[in-house]
Amino acid sequence: MKNQNVAIIIPSRLNSTRLIQKPLQLIGSITLIERVFKQVNKANIQHTYVATDSEEIANIIKKIGGKVILTDSDIPTGTDRTYEAFKLIPNNNNIHYIINVQGDIPFIEHRSILKIIEYLKNSEYDIVTPVVRVDRESIEASSNVTVAVDYMGKALYFSRSLIPHGAEELLYHLGIYGFRKNALEKFVSLKQTFLEKTERLEQLRILENGMTIGTCLVEDVPISVDTEEDLKKAIKFCREN
């Protein structure tokens, strides 16, 4: 099987500040976390896991044949949870790339994940992440994250505000991170930063500490479920497609 040195980890915390028991919310007939796992699993990566603090989430994934790693509930971010899970993967010395797919993207396309893997392997960035070009009018602030990049596509800043100011076309950030193993290990050794806490964006810890994030342009714009309104949009999308 290709990509034997890659692990995909989907961190899924039961309690969310903005949407109660978010992973267990139904979209159509199945839960949010089940939809995410099924989409990610289409990438056909052997080392694909859900990392969770919830037995209920674990049982849902196990029932559909998925692999689960149970983690503590007091882990600060999804990437920190990803690393805790990575340490528990058997024979993880053979894994050199870790893909963190946030557990709130129910319609993520597996081809975006595969593109990230290839881009990570063939670049010199510490971390890579996908972005999509969108019109300013089509994206709302607060529940969406945009990124400003340099001419080479290196990320300069991420924000829940629309950046850069005045631009008609923006880069919408998708919640997937491709880490080199040493970059992930460095990330979790660093303390949370002021900007990370202010924007509630863990990737700012990376930038504030001088590490590099490369952006990879993809075409799909999946819905990210962070609020009740996002959930309604996801349910509507599921019903219509």
Curated annotation (Swiss-Prot):
Function: Activates KDO (a required 8-carbon sugar) for incorporation into bacterial lipopolysaccharide in Gram-negative bacteria.
UniProt xrefs under HAMAP family: KdsB (MF_00057)
Principal location class: cytoplasm
Gene3D superfamilies: Spore Coat Polysaccharide Biosynthesis Protein SpsA, Chain A
This protein's name: 3-deoxy-manno-octulosonate cytidylyltransferase
Source taxonomy: Bacteria, Pseudomonadati, Pseudomonadota, Alphaproteobacteria, Rickettsiales
Localization per record: Cytoplasm
Pfam families linked to this entry: CTP_transf_3 (PF02348)
Enzyme Commission identifier(s): 2.7.7.38
UniProt similarity note: Belongs to the KdsB family.
Matching CDD domains: CMP-KDO-Synthetase
Gene symbol of the encoding locus: kdsB
